[in-house]
Amino acid sequence: MRQILLIVAAMLLTCCSSESDMNAQTNTNMGKTLIVYYSYTGNCREIVNSLAAQVTADQLEIQPAEKGLKYEANGYALGTQLLNAIKANPDDAASYPAIDPVSVSLADYQNIIIVTPLWWSQMAAIMQTYLFQSRDQMAGKTVALIVSSHSSGISGVVADAQRLLPSVTWAGDALWVNASNHSNRASLISTWLPTLNFQTTATAISHVNADRQQHRAYTLSGTLAQAGRKGIVIVDGKKYVR
């Protein structure tokens, strides 16, 4: 992954007394990454295992509320029924199949990697449910997509992801893992990861408690800036370049 270097030196504030009592509270996600996946046949779980060996990330598995369903039975009748219901009313929560409750807070993460199977040229309905329910929490996140299919192209899944997550920043092109290259997935992932434009540090100081008088400078990650460091400094709402 590309390292995003913060060259902005950040805030100067006026503080009181010789020993200023300043407490910079920074964003806590600090570029943390979450892998969100749904796996019906087990292929996506294998992809996640290979991915987890190469990137530091937490994992969240999405599960359907109703267990044991055979989505592929009778010519994929049930899977097609679920997808058609979503296509008919994509903005209606009732159109999406129920999933198990999720306790993970997306506020703890800046980067999200979605790993999903393809169902008849579309994103699996179970993953669509999670993204529909989480679209507001994902706003402003940096997101990457891995799609597993047998042989079908993934443009329909990419379109579903873009529809469901209109307010995210896409880190790069989606990775397609199919039946012919699944055994080579680790190599595919290692080639793909460096192409992603993921955020790896915090981007802001969320809150500063300060008394007035003495000046101190803090970086955007919340650490005390070194004396003489070049960058953009804000003093009493005015921007200075030093």
Predicted regions and their residues:
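Residue-level detector of functionally pivotal "anchor" positions at catalytic/ligand-binding pockets or at interdomain
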Residues: 18, 199-223
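Bacterial Sec-dependent N-terminal signal peptides
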Residues: 1-26
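C-terminal tail/sorting-segment detector
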Residues: 232-242
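Helix-loop-strand module that forms the ligand-binding subsite of alpha/beta enzymes
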Residues: 77-167
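Solvent-exposed loop/turn segments at secondary-structure junctions
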Residues: 40-43, 64-68, 118-122, 149-153, ...
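N-terminal beta1-alpha1-beta2 submodule of the flavodoxin-like/Rossmannoid cofactor-binding fold
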Residues: 23-114, 123, 190, 194
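Glycine-rich phosphate/pyrophosphate-binding loop and the adjoining helix
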Residues: 169-201
